[in-house]
Amino acid sequence: MGVKHFGARVKRLEDPALLTGRGRFVDDVKVPGVLHACFVRSPYAHARLQSIDAKAAMTMPGVHAVITASDLPEPMRSQPMPMLLPNPALAAVCTQHVLARDEVCYVGQAVAVVVADTRYIAEDAAAAVIVNYDVLDAVGDCRDAIKEGAPRAHSDLTTNVAST
């Protein structure tokens, strides 16, 4: 694309198919035997995981597995994911685990994953997984996070400051 195209109108070629219901999306592609995944995610900004009860989800027809951190093989279970782009300016390297083990540090952190025959079964089963949390103090503002005595975003770190 040359400079002459910046700011110029571009005719959209995909609209007729999409507007008439003839468009194809990745979700329209059906692969026989494919399984679907849905993550169980933390509703809390900071909490300790007390327990995960997947019994109800596992009894649902079409559910193949509910995987938690304790089900993962080593080293995925005990080691955090590697820092892909190490930066010497970081005071402490803090990468997350594939699935939360003992603590969740942000809303939406994956706690478990449900594997099922369809997306909808996986979503329903994920909703049936019962996670008990011990909610910890959290801080949601950068200015508050660096104040003396502020709750730490990650319990295993000594500060909320990643780099100076």
Name these PLM-found stretches.
Residues 1-164:
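Flexible, low-hydrophobicity surface segments
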